[in-house]
Amino acid sequence: ESRPLASSGLVGPDAATRLAAMPCDVVLNGITGSAGLMPTLATLEAGTTLALANKESLVIGGRLVTEAAAPGQMVAVDSEHSAFAQCLRAGRADEVRRLILTCSGGPFRGRSRAELADVTPEQAMKHPSWDMGRVITINSSTLVNKGLELLEAGLLYGVDLDDITVVVHPGSVVHSMVEFHDGATIAQLSPPDMKLPIALGLDWPRRIADASKPNDWSAPVDLHFEPLDSDAFGAVELARRCGKAGGSAPAVFNAANEVLVDAFCEGRIGFLDITDTIARVVDEHLALAGQPGGHLSDDQMTVDGVLAVDAWARTRAAELAEATA
């Protein structure tokens, strides 16, 4: 005779953090945005395997997160970072020349900066390859998401940001590649379906049979690649600059973006204003080192400090958005 499982509910702003700290085998953090930081830290402190889909918690926490994690405790769920994890098994860390992070290019691939000025929220919500929520879809249109993924890759795999190349791959079949120092490049290919990286995240390094459908190799497959237009889509290089500055700069990049995406979706700012205003907030943050809202170095990073910087960046981004409207 089957009996219903005992269950209970958790409510309140710290409910996800309390849940993440409970004994279990794996915690999959799929929260969107900086709200995922505390559940990520709670999971790591509990010694539980963390299947990380919330890239923002790693990006904003930086060393707070990486130093809290035991070797192998964090498993990437983003398709690109899952691809890196699979490809990196083909060689030693000291044999890696660079990581090649692929990008569909979003719905506005091929447009110049001038042609992006009149993009509407409705247009930005139409991604060519993936079906996702509002924030991540807009982030994929501005390529802020690719900037966050660049930072995540550097932190997860200990690779210098200058050794991570972003290339546009409209087919979304090659999820990322690793180039080794002998000239070999190892790639991970599969249809654009999150079932595979989620399955790997839950049972890494084992593979779950039939987790997703494979490519049909009897049909034509788009393996076209092209360089990223950093003039039209400046978010990736802005993220790289934040990562090189280290400390709290990536947290400011993320926090400002979250506010500005909302402002764009509400029609208060334009599409180009998102990345341009993030850059203004980042520049102000770096110039304020030693003052409230100013840059924290890696050694100065604390949870309270990061949260304070996050709050400052949100307030400043909202002020600049209001001035733009």
PLM region spans:
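Catalytic, metal-anchored helix/loop core of enzyme active sites in primary metabolism
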Residues: 1-325
